[in-house]
């Protein structure tokens, strides 16, 4: 409706004299001016009149025109129109000028003067604002923008409410609006929710919420969430409890209660404005208003000379868009992807594209950080930026890698648990850069111990020079797995670090691929020595023509800057490298050893061999002499070892000679191994030198950062790429277990309504790679040990018929990874995997005169292939709190460098197992994930390639993670742990708190939290609940620390003032006899400690050898006896169950025979009345028996299947002949750290949980999409961009995904959950029995017609079910319960007969047309050690690609109902067409045992 007479408005030209701008809003500017007609000072509000602002101008004009006569509203003098020829016209509102400015400006000026408004002044301003709002509400007007900047003060202290641009008229006092509009910090929850709501819910109570926020603003100087992005602020308003004053204890109870009443999240329970004005906080003001006005006038006068403070430009949100003055509305993209309204791939990609174009590389997914490599990530940040992320919550700042470091640091201090940060993604996605930024910020947070942080940063820089190299897609790629274990003392000050390196890609040293650059340190070293003119000292030549440097004649054009092509910069880098090593206590001799080893490796690469008959000989012997001189080894031994080796056969040593090709391979293996030992030596020395500051400053706390290879694919992929990608595959599996599977299982076990989380489970792919004996890595090991080539690998892969590992060509295999399918060349697999260095060469190096080189080849290796070294014992400051870290000490060595050699595959498997164990130590271990994504393939700043990003999103499960964080509970804590952490937030310090469920609920209610859930033993928190509690915890801890520091200062001052200063030497000298006794006592203790060493080694934590030999036979006897006792109890329990079952069968048999004897006389059919309903004729109904609920998880029985598991260490002693043992091989399953406790509780998960777990693990509901993931080729070549095939299927997938939940809930599963949760197994059909033995496959192969007839006959009637028959014995038509009167399931639970809860996954493998011999044999599903089922391999290898699941769930036989004919649930007749009662026999109903009634048709037998 038009209120403004636009055409008749006068022109303001020559009517006003404009002075200065006094305010600026989103839609207008306000100026102080003088009206020339009457010299009156007025306020001019000028705004553009266009289509966007027309409605707001009309509404503001109507409000000013009709209601400006109220004393708390500004006077309205008129409106004018200024025509503009080049733009929209301007509308000038002329209003009363308030010389005092805004209320919030006065508050901030007082705060700058270290003064604060008293509560009565705040109450007066709020009361006057309430009166203005009541006047508007009385006239059915919603203001919708009440805040401190819109409350004006006159020079005499009057209060005026202004700015009606967002005000709107409603139909009645309780009328509703439905537009999400306003300033974010002052929005009520219903206003924020209006963006998603379809019905209008905004009433005048929204102004009450804004009034409460304004009260906080006047008290603290700024509103809550003032420093947050609008999306973060709106998310906090909805999800978290209402905000409070910054320091509530500094204010009275009345103002806190007023704010609490105003900020009621439920709009229906929130008071009206007329009720708020009656609150004691406002009514207890003094009646003399003139006094209050004079006080405010004095404060205005006091703050007049204070310089105007800078204010951020105003903004407001309008239906998902952010508006600022003179700027186009920008769509509001959330910083947290878990806050997306409609989480689909398109919305996520659009949000990421917008953020990266705005220069924002990071986004949150709840508590997980998503990082996009924008090709311009900063390496250095000022101290002010670091300070923004110090002890802050996740939502207080923009998403950044520093927030992950800050949260991990706080969790480490609060929970006293080590924190892990795992970075994952493909190559060049920014993992190593983010890891370095994490370390920088952690050094900032832990700064305090002199020199500790500097040594840590320098050490990391030196290690990266050793292990980084250039690849075709990354000029600074990390070529190993690095663990940075940063240690901190009790107070959080950094004390040092422990560095662990695994899987160094040492083969890179000698590779012939020119596109793969060598490690950076080689280029640094050579260019530095060349610049220093020291080449002759290290037997090097002047040109860079070294085979291992791989320097091309001409530098090829590249978008990346490689270290190889920057000789000038390399000089400074190597100088920095040596300075770092000097700073961390490397002596000159050790630095010289490093130089000589690097020079020797370069020379080894230039050794040439020539053919001498059948064997090889060294062509350039002068290089061999130079190498022997550098390494200080015997030249003749070294020369001989290059072309000869010793073969021991039958106890006889024979000399063998290499061929030319074998000699080259041996030379390259020596160079690679020498470099690997050098890197291990340097890292071990760094760890050793770091141990002293850790002992001095303490190392009770730790944060471990895991930086590793990125997932990669080149034009030719070998064994190195297979290992790298398999490691990433395992890290993805660990992510799935922690984010998805653990949550669903815990929710089901705790009786929480289980949600359906979908993700792509890559366990089957990993099983095909790592499971013994058919996993690909075991196949490679078999080929390597049997000296076979790739033919054996290709044959074994072809025999598996797996869809995850396939034969691609004659020499190539394809592996379906979680990112896509990659092709690997197997021709060099076996040679590379052997990693064989001749023992003769090892012995040559052991005889080196250089102590460091001798040490590198003398000490043993760990199972991961790393060098061990002797560490000096350092006395810790507090031995009671000393922590042990994974150092490569001598006690960790178990592999000789000469004997018992391990393959690279064995080292790789042990490394993967070690990493999984470290990340899965306990359920409450803090693991923080950083998911890194590469934004493009062109290396352009802020470039965004949608197909590339989308493929990585699919691989990393970004969409599934968003849904999981929206619906799930990321934190799950036991009651005692939860109350131990947070009880002081809601309970008094002297209040007794029991660790119960009720107290957990009381804590949540006192804190006004929402979204949580309580299970039987655990608290379930959403990620924003956990963040809110952490923020409260941090605030309270700061207060505690401040109080403690003040009390300590007070006590210290009292002691000094009272003269109670403790002085040393106060005690006089003791008698010489006493001194002699003390010396003798100390000497005797020292002598005994030397004579009797401790039983446990302090460094390794293991028993010494003598003690272990003494204890071993007793421990073995005790263990065998314990196992025997367990087996006896197990066998006794099974015998007892068998006796119970036999007794029941005996009773059943006796009563059955007795009943049949009474029913031998047949009843004529014509005498049966089918319509009889008289109870007197039918007889009384049996009385139902009261039954106790039956729960398997309450039975104190634990599955002992693991005792006979061949993979278990106990069973290895019992079944030594059944294992394929290999020397020093670890047979532990690759996923053993993630397998759950094999107890009966885990076996007793309900069918619903199993159904959902199988659905998400196998993607049975979206088979096409899951097939697309592992069948799609993974390709990374910036020169040849390929269309992402997944993009073409996205629309169909999104449509299917949106309707997934409804389809899932409406699916007919054949069984239904009971309404009660007391019995999670109640209501499920019993499993069908195995079919009768069938003829062999040869019989059917020769008689196909007989096979067809038998198949049709079996499918014509349901299989018999004796368990269902027993159930029906105790029921009548009036009893709807499904529990038996006796515990027959308990009898069957430990027998081979399947239980009722397992019926839904059993399947008859009776497919037509199959020639397999066991196609008609009943096959129960396999069991893992956890007791949970997984799909049979046959299902995964089906040609349809449907994982073998949809048939098991969708085509299952429905169990017969209670009202079916008893014959259908008892034994089936041979002739299924018999329908008459005469053929069926006579109907009999008789109680054969107490509570057991037999009813059915009887025939003579």
UniProtKB/Swiss-Prot annotation:
The record's region (Non alpha-helical, C-terminal domain) falls at: 1066-1501
- Which stretches of sequence are listed as region Interaction with rtp? 1043-1271
Q: List the disulfide bonds.
A: none
Catalytic activity, reaction form: L-seryl-[protein] + ATP = O-phospho-L-seryl-[protein] + ADP + H(+); L-threonyl-[protein] + ATP = O-phospho-L-threonyl-[protein] + ADP + H(+)
Pfam families in the record, alphabetically?
IQ, Myosin_head, Pkinase
Write down the EC number.
Answer: 2.7.11.1
Post-translational modification Phosphoserine, affected residues: 183
Domain Myosin motor: residue ranges:
332-1037
Class in the EC hierarchy, top level: transferase
Compositional bias per record (Pro residues), positions renumbered to this chain: 1326-1335
Q: Where is the composition biased (Polar residues)?
A: 1449-1463
Residues of the IQ domain: 1036-1065, 1072-1101
Q: Where is the composition biased (Basic and acidic residues)?
A: 1405-1414
**One GO term of the cellular component aspect?**
cytoplasm
The GO biological-process annotations, alphabetized, read as: cytoskeleton organization; intracellular protein transport; negative regulation of opsin-mediated signaling pathway; photoreceptor cell maintenance; phototransduction; phototransduction, UV; phototransduction, visible light; protein localization
Q: According to the UniProt record, where is the region Disordered?
A: 1308-1364, 1390-1473
Gene3D superfamilies per record: 1.10.10.820, 1.20.5.190, 1.20.58.530, 6.20.240.20, Kinesin motor domain (3.40.850.10), Myosin VI head, motor domain, U50 subdomain (1.20.120.720), Transferase(Phosphotransferase) domain 1 (1.10.510.10)
> Hey, what tissues is this thing expressed in?
Expressed in the phototransducing compartment of photoreceptor cells, the rhabdomeres (at protein level).
Cellular compartments annotated: Cytoplasm; Cytoplasm, Cytoskeleton; Nucleus; Membrane
Key words of the record:
Actin-binding, ATP-binding, Cell membrane, Cell projection, Cytoplasm, Cytoskeleton, Kinase, Membrane, Motor protein, Myosin, Nucleotide-binding, Nucleus, Phosphoprotein, Repeat, Sensory transduction, Serine/threonine-protein kinase, Transferase, Vision
Regions of compositional bias (Low complexity) in chain numbering = 1336-1358
Q: What does this protein do?
A: Required for photoreceptor cell function. The ninaC proteins combines putative serine/threonine-protein kinase and myosin activities. Essential for the expression and stability of the rtp protein in the photoreceptors. The rtp/ninaC complex is required for stability of inad and inac and the normal termination of phototransduction in the retina.
Under the subunit heading, UniProt states: Interacts with rtp.
Q: What is this protein called?
A: Neither inactivation nor afterpotential protein C
């Amino acid at each position: 409706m038009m209120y403004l007479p636009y055409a008749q408005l006068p022109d303001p030209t020559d009517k006003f004299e404009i002075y200065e701008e006094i305010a600026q809003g989103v839609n207008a500017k306000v100026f102080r001016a003088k009206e020339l007609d009457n010299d009156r000072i007025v306020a001019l509000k000028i705004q553009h009149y266009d289509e966007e602002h027309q409605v707001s101008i009309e509404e503001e004009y109507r409000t000013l025109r009709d209601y400006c006569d109220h004393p708390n509203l500004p006077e309205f003098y008129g409106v004018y129109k200024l025509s503009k020829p080049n733009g929209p016209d301007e509308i000038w509102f002329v209003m009363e000028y308030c010389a005092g400015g805004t209320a919030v400006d006065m508050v901030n000026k007082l705060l700058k003067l270290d003064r604060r408004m008293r509560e009565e002044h705040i109450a007066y301003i709020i009361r006057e604002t309430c009166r203005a709002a009541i006047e508007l509400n009385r006239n059915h007007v919603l203001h919708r923008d009440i805040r401190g900047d819109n409350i004006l003060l006159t020079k005499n202290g009057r209060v005026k409410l202004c700015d009606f641009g967002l005000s709107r008229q409603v139909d009645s006092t309780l009328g509703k609006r439905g537009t999400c509009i306003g300033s974010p910090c002052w929005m009520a929850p219903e206003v924020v929710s209006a963006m998603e709501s379809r019905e209008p819910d905004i009433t005048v109570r929204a102004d009450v919420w804004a009034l409460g926020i304004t009260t906080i603003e006047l008290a603290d100087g700024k509103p809550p969430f003032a420093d947050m992005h609008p999306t973060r602020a709106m998310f906090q308003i909805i999800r978290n409890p209402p905000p409070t004053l910054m320091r509530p204890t500094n204010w009275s109870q009345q103002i806190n209660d007023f704010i609490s009443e105003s900020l009621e999240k439920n709009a229906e329970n929130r008071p009206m404005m007329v009720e708020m004005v009656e609150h004691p906080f406002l009514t207890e003001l003094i009646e003399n208003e003139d006094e209050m006005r004079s006080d405010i006038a004095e404060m205005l006068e006091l703050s007049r000379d204070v310089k105007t403070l800078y204010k951020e430009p105003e903004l407001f949100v309008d239906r998902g868009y952010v508006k600022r003055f003179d700027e186009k509305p920008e769509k509001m993209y959330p910083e947290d992807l878990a806050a997306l309204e409609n989480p689909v791939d398109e919305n996520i990609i659009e949000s990421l594209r917008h953020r990266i174009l705005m220069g924002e590389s990071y986004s949150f997914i709840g508590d997980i950080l998503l990082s996009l490599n924008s090709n311009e990530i900063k390496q250095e940040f000022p101290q002010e930026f670091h300070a923004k992320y110090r002890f802050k919550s996740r939502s207080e700042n923009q998403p950044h890698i520093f927030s992950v470091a800050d949260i991990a640091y706080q969790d480490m201090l609060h929970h006293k648990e080590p924190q892990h940060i795992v970075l994952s993604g493909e190559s060049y996605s920014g993992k190593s850069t983010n890891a370095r930024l994490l370390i920088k910020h952690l050094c900032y947070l832990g700064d305090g111990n002199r020199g500790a942080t500097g040594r840590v940063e320098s050490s990391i820089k030196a290690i990266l020079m050793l292990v980084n190299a250039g690849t075709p897609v990354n000029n600074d790629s990390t070529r190993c797995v690095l663990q940075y274990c940063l240690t901190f003392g009790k107070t959080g000050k950094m004390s040092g670090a422990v560095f662990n390196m695994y899987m160094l890609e040492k083969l890179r040293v000698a590779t012939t691929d020119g596109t793969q650059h060598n490690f950076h340190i080689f280029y640094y070293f050579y260019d530095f020595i060349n610049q220093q003119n020291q080449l002759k000292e290290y037997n090097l030549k002047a040109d860079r023509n070294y085979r291992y440097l791989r320097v091309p004649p001409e530098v090829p054009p590249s978008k990346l800057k490689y270290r190889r092509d920057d000789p000038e910069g390399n000089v400074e880098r190597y100088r920095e490298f040596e300075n770092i090593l000097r700073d961390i206590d490397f002596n000159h001799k050790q630095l010289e050893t490093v130089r000589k080893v690097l020079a020797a490796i370069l020379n080894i690469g230039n050794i040439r061999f020539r053919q001498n008959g059948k064997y090889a000989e060294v062509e350039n012997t002068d290089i061999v002499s130079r190498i022997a001189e550098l390494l200080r080894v015997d030249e003749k031994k070294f020369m001989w070892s290059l072309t000869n080796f010793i073969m021991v056969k039958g106890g006889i040593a024979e000399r063998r000679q290499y061929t030319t090709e074998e000699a080259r391979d041996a030379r390259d293996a020596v160079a690679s191994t020498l470099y690997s030992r050098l890197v291990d030596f340097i890292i071990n020395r760094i760890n050793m030198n770091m141990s002293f500051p850790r002992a001095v400053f303490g190392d009770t706390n730790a944060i471990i950062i895991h930086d590793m290879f990125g997932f990669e694919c080149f034009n030719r992929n070998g064994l190195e790429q297979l290992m790298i990608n398999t490691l990433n595959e395992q890290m993805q599996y660990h992510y799935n277990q922690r984010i998805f599977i653990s949550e669903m299982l815990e929710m089901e076990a705790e009786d929480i309504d289980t949600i359906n989380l979908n993700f792509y489970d890559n366990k089957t792919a990993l099983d095909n790679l790592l499971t013994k004996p058919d996993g690909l890595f075991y196949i490679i090991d078999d080929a390597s040990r049997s000296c076979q080539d790739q033919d054996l690998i290709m044959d074994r892969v072809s025999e598996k018929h797996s869809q995850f590992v396939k034969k691609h060509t004659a020499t190539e295999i394809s592996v379906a990874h979680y990112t896509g399918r990659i092709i690997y060349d197997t021709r060099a697999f076996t040679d590379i995997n052997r990693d064989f260095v001749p023992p003769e060469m090892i012995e040559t190096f052991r005889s080196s005169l250089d102590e460091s080189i001798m040490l590198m080849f003398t000490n043993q290796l760990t199972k991961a292939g790393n060098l061990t070294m002797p560490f000096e014992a350092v006395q810790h400051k507090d031995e009671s709190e000393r922590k042990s870290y994974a150092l490569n000490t001598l006690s960790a060595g178990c592999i000789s460098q000469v004997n018992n050699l391990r393959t690279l595959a064995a080292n790789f498997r042990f490394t993967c197992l070690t990493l999984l164990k470290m990340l899965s130590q306990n359920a409450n271990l803090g693991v923080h994930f950083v998911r890194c994504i590469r934004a493009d393939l062109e290396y352009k700043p802020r470039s965004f390639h949608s197909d590339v990003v989308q493929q990585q999103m699919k691989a990393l499960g970004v969409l599934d993670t968003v849904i999981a964080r929206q619906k799930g509970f990321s934190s799950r804590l036991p009651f005692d742990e939860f109350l131990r952490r947070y009880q002081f937030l809601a309970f008094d310090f002297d209040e007794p708190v029991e660790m119960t469920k009720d107290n957990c609920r009381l804590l949540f209610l006192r804190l006004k939290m929402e979204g949580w859930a309580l299970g039987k033993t655990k608290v379930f928190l959403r990620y924003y609940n956990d963040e809110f509690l952490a923020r409260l915890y941090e605030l309270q801890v700061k207060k505690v620390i401040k109080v403690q520091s003040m009390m300590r200062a007070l006590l210290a001052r009292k002691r000094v003032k009272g003269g109670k200063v403790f002085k040393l030497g106060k005690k006089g000298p003791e008698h010489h006899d006493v001194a002699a006794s003390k010396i003798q006592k100390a000497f005797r203790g020292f002598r005994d400690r030397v004579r009797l060493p401790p039983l446990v080694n302090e460094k390794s934590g293991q028993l010494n050898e003598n003690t272990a030999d003494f204890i071993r036979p007793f421990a073995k006897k005790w263990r065998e006896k314990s196992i025997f006792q367990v087996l006896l109890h197990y066998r006794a329990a099974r015998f007892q169950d068998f006796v119970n079952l036999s007794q029941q069968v005996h009773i059943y048999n006796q009563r059955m025979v007795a009943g049949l004897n009474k029913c031998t006389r047949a009843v004529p059919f014509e005498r049966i009345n089918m319509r009889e309903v008289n109870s007197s004729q039918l007889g009384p109904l049996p009385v139902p028996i009261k039954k106790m609920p039956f729960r398997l998880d309450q039975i104190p029985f634990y599955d002992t299947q693991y005792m006979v598991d061949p993979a278990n260490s106990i069973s290895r002693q019992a079944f030594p002949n059944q294992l394929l043992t290999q020397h020093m091989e670890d047979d532990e399953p690759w996923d053993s750290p993630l397998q759950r406790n094999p107890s009966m509780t885990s076996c007793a998960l309900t069918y619903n949980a199993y159904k959902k777990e199988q659905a998400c693990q196998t993607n049975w509901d979206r088979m096409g999409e899951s097939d697309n993931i592992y069948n799609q080729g993974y390709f990374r070549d910036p020169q040849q961009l390929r269309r992402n095939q997944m993009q073409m299927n996205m629309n169909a997938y999104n449509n299917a995904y949106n309707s997934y939940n409804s389809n899932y809930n409406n699916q007919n599963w054949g069984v239904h959950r009971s309404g009660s949760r007391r019995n999670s197994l109640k209501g499920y059909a019993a499993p069908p029995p195995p079919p009768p033995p069938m003829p062999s496959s040869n019989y059917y192969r020769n008689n196909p017609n007989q096979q067809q007839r038998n198949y049709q006959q079996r499918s014509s009637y349901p299989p018999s079910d004796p368990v269902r028959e027993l159930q029906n014995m105790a029921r009548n038509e009036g009893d709807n319960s499904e529990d038996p009167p006796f515990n027959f399931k308990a009898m069957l639970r430990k027998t081979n007969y399947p239980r009722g809860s397992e019926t839904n996954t059993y399947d008859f493998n009776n497919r037509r047309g199959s020639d397999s011999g066991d196609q008609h044999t009943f096959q129960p599903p396999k069991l893992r050690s956890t007791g949970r089922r997984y799909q049979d391999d046959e299902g995964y290898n089906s040609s349809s690609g449907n994982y073998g699941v949809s048939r098991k769930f969708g085509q299952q036989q429905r169990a017969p109902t209670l009202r079916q004919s008893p014959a259908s649930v008892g034994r089936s007749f041979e002739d299924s067409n018999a329908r008459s009662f005469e053929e069926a026999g006579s109907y009999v109903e008789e109680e054969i045992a107490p509570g057991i009634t037999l009813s059915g048709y009887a025939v003579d037998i």
